[in-house]
From Swiss-Prot:
This is Undecaprenyl-diphosphatase. Catalyzes the dephosphorylation of undecaprenyl diphosphate (UPP). Confers resistance to bacitracin. InterPro entries: UppP (IPR003824). It is found in: Cell inner membrane. Its EC number is 3.6.1.27. Belongs to the UppP family.
Amino acid sequence: MELWLAAQAFILGVVEGLTEFLPISSTGHQIIIADLIGFGGDRAKAFNIIIQLGAILAVVWEFREKVFGVILGLPREPQAQRFTVNLLIAFLPAVVLGVAFADLIEHWLFNPITVASALVVGGLVMLWAERRQHVIEVHAVDEMNWRHALKIGCAQCLAMIPGTSRSGSTIIGGLLFGLSRKAATEFSFFLAMPTMVGAAAYSGYKHRALFENGGDLPVFALGFVVSFIFAMLAVRGLLRFIASHSYALFAWYRIGFGLLILLTWQLGVVDWSTAQG
């Protein structure tokens, strides 16, 4: 494995791990950083699937007690059954819209200008949601009903626009629909499991021919491990952070980063308009 290729794999593994579960858009950061370091083409498509699996494994491991508790409790515990139903209800809207529009969105919207615009708009919405007074109806994920799940699932569909952020849309959706900050964040993590596994499986099947080159295995392995490690650090850090802070810091980061991309484009510093994810 070439040194620069290993460095690219490491950088993008770090980016995926740190941004996947923070409300700042992992896809948006991947598109922008990959373009800056010149990592693209078919190898990049396959690589992105692999590093997403690393991030998924991290959140499953971090919440393993809850995950295994739900699985073991499904046959007999109403709480586990209700939680599973809520998760499936929240997952379905993304499945329907993803199958219908994924290719169109990837073709037309996977570029840094769309990402930057979505980062700014999403940041403004996040600030509004945090400052808006709302009554907390749900303090823990086990208190949710199917209506909460459906609304959050619909909010997650906004994340099909790169730069919006899957975790950002579900967390802010949860806050607006009556969940506490902790409950909204945890449900976002749980919802990521079926959503990301489904997306990775769909993309993996669609691009299955890209995995026939065994020479890329060391690159994929490095990206997977790095993504897993940094995703676990990000999940733990976010849970500690939101215990005593709002999401305003992430909102301002989104706005600043998005405006920086748009400014460099307008000034001609970087020709983002021709870049593709």
